[in-house]
A protein has these predicted regions:
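A short glycine-rich, His/Asp/Glu-containing loop-to-beta-strand
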Residues: 2-32, 90
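Short beta-strand segments in beta-sandwich/barrel cores
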Residues: 24, 33-34, 50-55
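Glycine- and acidic-residue-biased ligand/ion/polar-headgroup-sensing regions
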Residues: 41-52
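A cytosolic small-molecule/anion-sensing beta-strand core signal
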Residues: 48-49, 64-65, 83
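Short acidic-glycine-tyrosine-enriched beta hairpin
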Residues: 57-73
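Ligand-binding loop in jelly-roll beta-barrel domains
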Residues: 73-95
Length: 95
């Protein structure tokens, strides 16, 4: 099955999901915050439009298109959009 991120305009929409993986397309507007949370899965965040402050526990990164963030399970993190932004979040159970 083929998906295009152009087809997704909602804030967060799962575009693929099975027992071991979830792929989510995420739109966040400038100044919007996604509060601190964690997950039991490994996470890869790929930003392809905009600019986001990504906070991982006590570290803060500004991410832009071309940047990739990788997180191990259980790591608390949050996001704040500097500009309107689009990201792909891939959560995988690597056990």
């Amino acid at each position: 099955m083929k998906y295009s991120v152009k087809d997704f305009d909602e804030k967060a929409q799962n575009i693929y999901q099975n027992d071991n993986q979830v792929v989510t397309h995420l739109n966040i507007k400038a100044d919007q915050i996604i509060p601190t949370h964690d997950t039991s899965m490994s996470v890869v965040v790929v930003i392809y439009e905009g600019e986001v402050i990504f906070t991982e526990e006590d570290k803060e990164f500004t991410i832009k298109p071309g940047d990739i963030i990788q997180l191990d399970p259980g790591i608390a993190h949050s996001l704040k959009a500097i500009k309107d932004s689009k990201l792909m979040v891939i959560k995988s159970d690597l056990k």
